[in-house]
Amino acid sequence: MSTARPLKSVDYEVFGRVQGVCFRMYAEDEARKIGVVGWVKNTSKGTVTGQVQGPEEKVNSMKSWLSKVGSPSSRIDRTNFSNEKTISKLEYSNFSVRY
């Protein structure tokens, strides 16, 4: 009998003023505080993209941060979430900034 909570994975892309405002560093800190794993990186088109994995309620907390909070100097216009699915195990051991 397993009491493990289901794990979720979701991809995201954040639009707005999200580069040059320490967004990735704050995202990494927030993910570690919440307890999710995955990654974040800048794109060549001025957005921030990545993936979040963890228990559903923690992933939902990170989704809220990515769409409403961000770093202090950022301005989030919108956040697109895609490929949301249930996973059997985490694919990452931590949350990291990619370059």
Curated annotation (Swiss-Prot):
<dbReference type="InterPro" id="IPR001792">
    <property type="entry name" value="Acylphosphatase-like_dom"/>
</dbReference>
<feature type="active site">
    <location>
        <position position="42"/>
    </location>
</feature>
<keyword id="KW-0318">Glutathionylation</keyword>
<dbReference type="GO" id="GO:0003998">
    <property type="term" value="F:acylphosphatase activity"/>
</dbReference>
<feature type="modified residue" description="S-glutathionyl cysteine">
    <location>
        <position position="22"/>
    </location>
</feature>
<feature type="modified residue" description="Phosphoserine">
    <location>
        <position position="93"/>
    </location>
</feature>
<feature type="domain" description="Acylphosphatase-like">
    <location>
        <begin position="9"/>
        <end position="99"/>
    </location>
</feature>
<keyword id="KW-0378">Hydrolase</keyword>
<keyword id="KW-0007">Acetylation</keyword>
<comment type="similarity">
    <text>Belongs to the acylphosphatase family.</text>
</comment>
<protein>
    <recommendedName>
        <fullName>Acylphosphatase-2</fullName>
        <ecNumber>3.6.1.7</ecNumber>
    </recommendedName>
</protein>
<feature type="modified residue" description="N-acetylserine">
    <location>
        <position position="2"/>
    </location>
</feature>
<dbReference type="InterPro" id="IPR020456">
    <property type="entry name" value="Acylphosphatase"/>
</dbReference>
<dbReference type="InterPro" id="IPR017968">
    <property type="entry name" value="Acylphosphatase_CS"/>
</dbReference>
<dbReference type="InterPro" id="IPR036046">
    <property type="entry name" value="Acylphosphatase-like_dom_sf"/>
</dbReference>
<dbReference type="Pfam" id="PF00708">
    <property type="entry name" value="Acylphosphatase"/>
</dbReference>
<keyword id="KW-0597">Phosphoprotein</keyword>
<comment type="function">
    <text>Its physiological role is not yet clear.</text>
</comment>
<feature type="active site">
    <location>
        <position position="24"/>
    </location>
</feature>
